[in-house]
Every structure is written in structure tokens, then in C-alpha cells.
């Protein structure tokens, strides 16, 4: 019998007997474990061989045998739990232990660096599963980061300085305002072994032609081997950066026929997905990656929903052994913000916008927050920390305003915290705030109407590219803000948009009301090198490494 199964049987027997040695019979024990008398005898003999108990059998009708426990079920359960942790079987660990507080304590104690069979393993604790990693779909902040570790694109953007770099394409040139040419590397392989072909690249870029930022791509052809020509309907100075974004990452052309591709995707990036469940995401360094092989062999993201109730300001890489060290922190490039929905009469009413933005000002939200959040929140007066576009102007409550509807996407604890503060403030003004939580996909599509929306945005480098690109690619914003998005996109592509002025107009009209900038923190081990926090609050796994202990 496999050791794990035998351990489970012993723990169950120990629990049924309440850990007490006793006189009993094979029939009674078999009934406790719901097995045959013969199988019960085999179990007892095997457990006795392991040194867990003694079984002194008595022969004869009416005679009772002696069962003595030498090992406690708790000790064996702890040993089994340790084995499951080392094997990264978090789902089985949760079933075995049951108690969430104990599971969390065990997980935290095993965070950070592990060295097993010559491999460097990094363990990270996160509050929710990362089940959708499909480029071009609605991806949240962390899924966006993970997708960048799994997939490659024609170009890539350096997370530290925002500079454009080569990826699958090693060079490119602009032939004319409407014609770009990219030269691709040969010998690039997907994680499932097949070599990348030009048809994969063409299919990947054609599949996103329906997205607003890619709708101006008229044609994609390969005139010669490993050469790609992209023809546009509008000039686009940002095209090389646009092709380095997550939606433009390269998928195998047969991706729709592959099982569970969204949660177990196959790319050409530095890491391949090994496991992705509700309890764990495991990615492993791809030995055939066309660039520098990752220095960390394996990254395990353990999911523990209970930590969602804590302030989401830090990424925890290290357990409690010794003092936690703050490796890096930064104020996010982005903010939480209110979005007024012009499709509802209250959302479109300028008096309602002025008054709500006055009573729900950033300083009011921070003032009414608990101290643990005040340490991580900074009042926002623009979409970026360096901007001061919003001015707090006293406004009178509109006559007849008795209720408002606020909607945000679920699985985000700080949304609930901020919404609760808003509800408290508005109640003091005799306004009822009805709160709705919807899925991230529903939020992204924006087909549901709400007076106001609570959103957040994290912009990546370079900011003059990503800020408009991020806002333009969220359908919800286009539904709520009635401006000519296509005309603005054309001006942005031509380099004719003053981005700061454009954002200031959105804030001045109260279409968007900045609320809070968030401090992002990574805590971990001093032995980790090459760790540079990006604007998403994560770091590039393939560039990090562990320094060996001093000799």
C-alpha cells in the first residue's frame, strides 16, 4: 500500500479510537474503517511493521485482542503534511489538515527559497487562484505579470526602464507610415516541443484584430522566411511597443484545440505551466527557451484565500524564520478611482458627480480607514502620483438624492474596504449606497449599468504609452465615458495627443475621480539577488537568483 494511503488509514484509526490503547476485535476495527476483516489484518500488520502501533492478536471465540498506539495521529499527520508541502500538494494538504489557520502557518513557514535535488525553488503566497492566463482576454494585474513569464511576443518592454527590446523579432523597421517589417528568430520552440512557425505568429496577431488598439492592422503577411510585414490603415508610432503587450503574445495556432488552454497555456517564454489549480500555480524554467535560461528553476504560487482580508500591499516571499526584510517598495503608477456611468441619470448628472467626489474625497477615505490601510494608502489627485489634476471643491447635495449604486469586481478585499468606507460616509448624509460585486469579465465588458464604479489601474512603463493603451482597451470605460475614443486613438497613434491634458479633462469632468495610490512592497530573503519590483508589484522571475551561503 502506498505510504500516503497507509498514513491516512492510521490517522483515521487513531481518531476513531480517540488515540487510546484498548482491547478490541478485528471485526470492530474493520467496521470503523469500513473495510473487510482480512484487509484490516493486513493494515494492522503493516502499521506494526512501521512502528506506529502494536497488535497482540488473541485466537478464540469471545477473546479480544490488544491494540496499543506507539505513534500519535497528530504526529503522523504533521509528518504527512510536511511531505505534502515538500511535494507542493497544497490541495491534499488542505484536505488533510482542515484547519485554515494551521494550513496558513505551515505555508508561511515554507515560503521563500528551497533547494531540492539541485534545483532552486521559489515559493510565494497569494490570496486567489490565477486560473485565466490567456493573452487577449480580460486579465488582472497578477495574471498579466504571469502571462509575461509564460509567453513571448515580437518585442518586449524592459520592466525597469520602459525601453523597447528585441524578443522573437530581433530587428524591425518602418518601411512607410503604414508598413512595418519584422525579422524573426528561427529555432524558437513552444513548451510542448513544436518549433514556432510563421503561421503561429500570423494567427496570433490576427486573432486580436477585434481589440480597439489592434483594429487598424489591415494585413499580415510573410514575404520571405522569418520576415513579417504588417500593413496598417492608420499610422502608428507605437506599433513596436503595442506588439510587446500581453494581448499580442504568440500562441500556437492550434491553441483552441488544446485542453484547458486558458489555465494551462503553452507559450515560448522562459517558464512553462506545470500545474494550475485553485490551490497552486507551478511554473518551471523552460530549458529550450531561446533567450537566457531562468536562474530560478521553479516558482510555486500557493493560494490561501484567507490572506485576502489583509491589506494587499505586499508580496510575501519569506516565512517568519528571522525578521522579514523589506526588499523594495514603491508607490504604484496608477490608482483606485471612481468611474461615473453616463448611461444612468444619476451617473450622468454633473451635480451628483460634484457632490459625490466632494464627500468621497481621497482625504476623507484615508481619514476613515483603519490604521493598517492608512499606512499603505496615499491620497490621489491624478491618475499618476506626479499629477495634481483634481481639486476638492465644496458642493451641495443634490435635491432628492437618496441612493446610489456602486459596482466593483469580486475577489479584491480592498474594494470591499473602500466601498464600506464610502457606504459609511454617504449614510451620514442620508444617502444609501447599494453595493454590487460582479465577476472580472463582467466588469471588463461593462454591459451592466451602475451609477458609479470602483476601479483600479496599474500602468506599466513607458507611461506615455501604457496609460492611454490601458484605458482604451477596457470596454467598460468606453461605455461609461461618451467621448470619441477612435479619434483620440488616432491622435495618440500619431503622437499628437497631450496625454496629461487628456487625463486632466477626464478628471475635471468628474468622469473619473482618483482616490488612492497604493504602496507596493516585496518582502523576502536577503539571499535573493536581481530582484527589481515592476509597476505591477511583482518582479521578473527569470532575472532573479539566490546567492549561495557564505563558505
UniProtKB/Swiss-Prot annotation:
DNA-binding listed as a keyword: yes
UniProt domain HTH marR-type: residue ranges: 1-116
UniProt-recorded Gene Ontology molecular function terms: DNA binding; peptide transmembrane transporter activity
Family matches, as Gene3D superfamilies: Periplasmic binding protein-like II
Protein name according to UniProt: HTH-type transcriptional regulator SgrR
Residue ranges, annotated region (Solute-binding): 163-492
Keywords: Activator, DNA-binding, Repressor, Transcription, Transcription regulation
Organism: Escherichia coli O1:K1 / APEC
Entry's Gene Ontology BP terms: negative regulation of DNA-templated transcription; peptide transport; positive regulation of DNA-templated transcription
SUPFAM superfamilies xrefs: Periplasmic binding protein-like II
One family name in Pfam for this protein: SgrR_N
DNA-binding annotation, residue ranges on this chain: 26-49
